[in-house]
């Protein structure tokens, strides 16, 4: 099912509850989006649906409204601890957002209780909250929901509570599978009743999603909603009101271009994407130091407890910058994001589309910009063909200020900045090596010297990818970087303590090594001969071109060693035999006669 149109909520064949319509008016949504007008009637007629629609198309309301309508039509009212609907979503941020949208509706229906189960919170408190207040509608991430099904100690029997389940929703299904939640979802499905309505929502249809459809849905109606005015054969995967741009610049120009761009738009709201958590940590601190009048927040997947708070804070801001990884790339609806900036291209092409989709949400306008290195220019055509995502070039700004010396000065003044920069560089190189588009993003073509200058490094890090390479275009600082202190006095004190401990250990180890060297000569010699014999055997097995006279010498030495070990000859005789063997080989070599010729 593809050809659907927008329309008024009142035009639905199955009428909505007056209080649902009232909540929609409060939210400022007088009309349905195509995905909503296609999905809601089917869901309400007890059909399983598998919906594919571009990011920012209004998928959340497409399942929130049917959940409420189906629960309102139940013959038997839900008790406090009976679960009528479950929404599973891949990230905490998306779960928080869905819970917030749902609360706009449930406040009009006090008979329904809702509960949010996500990581970063105390699971014991979640259990107590459910026991006290109930949870007719659960919004959860897969890991926490699976954990709740397995909990027995706190007196929670969730398996019994879900026997009344009417609706299951799997939101961002492709991301659920990409993030490795397949096993958790399968476990959860085993606990749920078969007689239920299931909705699967996704921005892309992959083979893995298709497998999940077969496993979790019964005779589903498939919905694929396209952007208006675009031919089916070339369906654009980003919102039609999104302006996509790219900028080609060298690795050591990129940061200056980014700061110039952000300074010229300080009153706007931006998302800045980096490829790794370490890059977010480093460049987030750098931007804080250089854009003092702008509110800057950082968020990434390794933040366990701060993420929820940071996400909510940024949503409330009128202007500011959120520096983030792909943890913010899917489904998140942040009000009035003006620009999505991709400092690093994502590891796969579909993530590019999802990043861009954080702006131009539900009919609003928005813009996106990706920074590319000269060697990555082919990525533009790749996106146009592979993701149906055309991009327009944005000219390089020529009047930018070089801020890299300031970053270097920050690293020299504080070891924390120096270490963050080194970690960020290493993590970026490692992520680059794993890029899905390896024909375009080739590690061997990367300008490591320019990249190091762009990261404002004081010296090149030691890492396998740089081993054996020379960097004449990179000038390291002329100081011992081990002498750079932490600004934080407590951290510096701990560092000095560790350095002293290492010095002592090194000194003790050197003493032990000297003692080991004073072993009996005969034992050392025997060990050396064993090693020699093993190497000779290995070379022979590998088809080595070792000549016959060397092999004969080795065999003679081995025979002597065996006799010496068995006590058949003395140490003096052993040494004499080795010398005789070596002398004989030299003489024969000088004469040009091999051992085999003499023996014959």
Swiss-Prot record:
Pfam families: CTE_SPB4 (PF13959), DEAD (PF00270), Helicase_C (PF00271). Gene3D superfamilies: P-loop containing nucleotide triphosphate hydrolases. It is found in: Nucleus, Nucleoplasm. Its EC number is 3.6.4.13. It catalyses: ATP + H2O = ADP + phosphate + H(+). It comes from the Eukaryota. InterPro entries: DEAD/DEAH_box_helicase_dom, Helicase_ATP-bd, Helicase_C-like, P-loop_NTPase, RNA-helicase_DEAD-box_CS, RNA_helicase_DEAD_Q_motif, SPB4-like_CTE. Signal peptide: none annotated. Residues 514-538 have a biased composition (Basic residues). Residues 499-551 are annotated as: Disordered. A motif (DEAD box) lies at residues 171-174. Residues 499-513 have a biased composition (Basic and acidic residues). Probable ATP-binding RNA helicase. Has ATPase activity and is involved in the maturation of precursor large subunit rRNAs. Residues 533-562 are annotated as: Important for nuclear localization. Residues 254-402 form the Helicase C-terminal domain. Interacts with 28S rRNA. Interacts with double-stranded RNA substrates in vitro; the interaction stimulates ATPase activity. This is ATP-dependent RNA helicase DDX55. One of its GO terms (cellular component) is cytosol. Belongs to the DEAD box helicase family. DDX55/SPB4 subfamily. A motif (Q motif) lies at residues 9-37. It comes from Mus musculus (Mouse). PROSITE patterns: DEAD_ATP_HELICASE, HELICASE_ATP_BIND_1, HELICASE_CTER, Q_MOTIF. Residues 40-223 form the Helicase ATP-binding domain. The Q motif is unique to and characteristic of the DEAD box family of RNA helicases and controls ATP binding and hydrolysis.
